[in-house]
């Protein structure tokens, strides 16, 4: 009898060890890992590449994410720099995923005429149970690089979700003097998809109002817009989402050649209405937040509305 009673205990221990081992292996495979270099961070999920965050570059004078990969290891952003078989337009202005502004107090950070300088890490790259995070302080300098127009504190969260990799960008802009955000198409959070995903190569843009491709999506306000297509035999893409608590609902600047941006600033640019300025008083701040879901699910398996709700649930 004593021997018979011990057998279930032995099996229970063995099963618990197996469950713990499986759980540990799964956690390691989904763990966000950071490799900090002199001017960039290599971001991996487990042993697989996710993206490179470049915070200092001679040619691109603002931070950006390049070489962004979906969970199935297929790259979803255009090669940076563009390769011979890539479309060659906007080689420096469209490096992958970025936030930029064509007019802050008359200075153009989108077209690289005024620099954004990485000042320091407020929070160094840190792995968390649900993903990883880091926070940077960026200084937006005047065109002559002599004065600071404003200071951005930006938190990046990389979350491993059942539907893909979710990048959340939460920014706060402030200064010790007044400044303003102007009214242009080229403002906000943007991304350039891999060349095979562009609409002109068979890809598709779809927004939360079921409008499709550049002709219908451009200049329309929406909660999200997805840019997807087939690459290397699999369906991959990115969904650009705006926080509904931003100061204004975003319009989308969308192009069939592979570009899209979420822009809450462009009243005149997108509607033809009166040209707007978002003024920020000295000591006050403006906050904006966006998300990008990088996915590799089959086209008929994607529930964009559910993915957007999941994004909202992750906001802190």
How would you label these PLM feature ranges?
Residues 241-316:
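Beta-strand-rich recognition/accessory modules
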Residues 1-7:
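N-terminal secretory signal peptides that target proteins for export/translocation
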Residues 27-91, 161, 244, 299, ...:
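Beta-strand-rich N-terminal accessory domains
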Residues 10-22:
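Bacterial N-terminal signal peptides
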